[in-house]
Amino acid sequence: MSMKDLKISQLIVKHYFQKLNDVLNVDVAIAGCGPSALALATELAKNGRKVAIFEAKNEPGGGIWGGGMMFNELVLESELEWYLKEHHIKYKKEDEFIVVDAVHFASAMLYNATKNGAYIFNNVFVEDLVMYNERISGVVINWMPTIKEKLHVDPITVVAKFTVDGTGHPANLVRLLSKRGIINSVKGSSENLCSCGVVEYEFPMDAENGEKFVVENTKEIYPGLYVMGMAAVSVGGGPRMGPIFGGMIMSGLRAAELIEEELKRIETSEDKMWVRV
């Protein structure tokens, strides 16, 4: 009797379990695996941070793959040429813009994130948040098929020093707080929310201003919870920008910068419970 089939199953179960067990306590948990998440994860993982991305779909990469209207090319501003060179991504220059093959770009982003040590879990949905002492401290996860089929199966918890909403247009994590009235508590930031406590929706297309807006609105929206990418646009009520991805990359890099600063602050602080002082 051949043991090859058994060994294949054993190896998959063993190594997936090891991987999942390793991320139950992380520095950063990210919901959604779009370009901002990949840029953020790559930077923090390079710094030795433990980063886990949870993507509900089977194919991580967010909106990169389809380019513009399924023309699988995408555009970045020429200011991002350094980033493409640093990550060995092929591109073509056209005036003040850069054109990149969408499939190549998505593949390269995924490769660089995982090569540097970030974990990516596809088919895993972030259904809720962990909160300790009025601070977001991780995510609650379940299999996406469980959610789609509405099966009565309890989720499990991943504890994180910082959590990031990278769910794109829906801004799922922020809305989890908004619908409970938590986002407007005394410790929450409400400057870019409606007075009624409902999160704004993104405005119509305006690529130039949308690219600026997404970076400016990448921030900590509630203690322990950051927004970036299209989630930051939706939360702030900014304009969408379509198949230009410079703002997405810069948003992820901005989030990485902000979170790295906070992680260093925690390391030098006597505050061991990750609660802001």
From Swiss-Prot:
Q: Which GO terms describe its molecular function?
A: iron ion binding; pentosyltransferase activity
Binding positions (glycine): R240
Coiled coil (residue ranges): none
Q: According to its UniProt record, which cofactors does this protein need?
A: Fe(2+)
Name a biological process GO annotation: thiamine biosynthetic process
Q: Where does NAD(+) bind?
A: S36, G63, V126, H152, V153, D154, M230
Q: Which reaction does it catalyse?
A: hydrogen sulfide + glycine + NAD(+) = ADP-5-ethyl-4-methylthiazole-2-carboxylate + nicotinamide + 3 H2O + H(+)
**How does the annotation summarize its subunit structure?**
Homooctamer; tetramer of dimers.
Describe the family membership recorded for this protein in Swiss-Prot or TrEMBL: Belongs to the THI4 family.
* Record-given protein name: Thiamine thiazole synthase
The record lists the organism as: Fervidobacterium nodosum (strain ATCC 35602 / DSM 5306 / Rt17-B1)
Which gene underlies this protein?
thi4
